[in-house]
A protein has these predicted regions:
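Patatin-like phospholipase
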Residues: 1-38, 46-275
Length: 275
């Protein structure tokens, strides 16, 4: 497939940076012809693949950001570790249903691949283009089901969780499109993250879990980028790393700022790629 494939990685609210990245790509005449998405990056990619304009997606994300999506499951205080997650999955699903309704992968204007993790096999599983078929909302809830926060999602008898557990920036999946160029926008955990400047302090158990998973995700991304460079015959990869903060998964008050940072970082990366 001739053209640019965009890989929009996971990062919670920071995934709004993908909207700025999309805007920068289109301004340079590099509008993606297909998308690979993971976690909330898959939500952004799905909206764009359906043909929505970046500005419209940003408005919808800001609107959804005002909803109470992170709702603590009250039974956690009664049953403790017998529960599957800290948060109720219903509000997250309701938000995605409000955004996408009954949309399916077959409705996409441009092809979309979403990465999820099979909790039992540990495999990275793809849905959509070059992968399995399932209702779009089910797959989006699954790829956003970060363990501890949200429970696994059962699709076709298999338990799936956040795609970022296996690959928060699934660049290899872009190769299935046989693209001329890949642009990967990384808003996931990294060893370059700045300390959080605002927001409530996380409880110790959650902070330790989040930091531990983040270390694994960050190293996994570095390993994949190194492998890409060392593997002959792969298309050019433009890596975009917006400036992000730690513990900003639910920082929905910063969506517009993240979108602008994605725009800045993508313009900078595209300029550097020409030199």
């Amino acid at each position: 497939m001739s053209g640019v494939i965009a890989v929009y990685g996971g990062g919670g609210a920071k995934a709004a940076a993908h909207l700025g990245a999309e805007r920068a790509l289109r301004e340079k005449g590099l509008a993606p012809i297909g998308y690979v998405g993971c976690s909330l990056g898959a939500v952004v990619a799905a909206a764009l693949a359906l043909g929505w304009e970046p500005a419209a997606v940003e408005e919808r994300m800001v609107e959804l950001g005002r909803r109470r999506i992170a709702v603590v499951d009250p039974l956690i205080f009664l049953l403790g570790i017998k529960r599957q997650s800290l948060l109720k999955p219903g509000p997250l699903r309701a938000a995605f249903e409000a955004l996408f309704g009954g949309a399916r992968f077959s409705d996409m204007v441009r092809p979309l691949t979403i990465a999820v993790t099979d909790l039992d096999s540990g495999d990275l599983v793809l849905f959509g283009a070059h992968g399995k078929d399932a209702p779009l909302v089910d797959v989006l809830v699954a790829t956003c089901a970060l363990p501890l926060y949200f429970p696994p999602v059962v699709i076709g008898g298999r338990r799936y969780v956040d795609g970022g557990i296996r690959s928060v920036l699934p660049i290899e999946s872009a190769l299935l499109f046989a693209p001329d160029r890949v642009v990967a926008v990384d808003v996931g955990p990294g060893f370059d993250e700045a300390p959080a400047t605002s927001g409530a302090t996380l409880p110790a158990l959650i902070e330790i879990n989040q930091s531990s998973i983040g270390i694994s995700m960050a190293q996994g991304t570095l390993d994949r980028l190194d492998l890409w460079k060392l593997t002959p015959g792969r298309p050019p990869l433009t890596y975009v790393r917006p400036r992000v903060e730690k513990n900003a998964t639910f920082a929905t008050d910063k969506l517009r700022a993240y979108a602008e940072e994605g725009y800045r970082a993508t313009k900078e990366a595209l300029s550097a790629a020409r030199t």
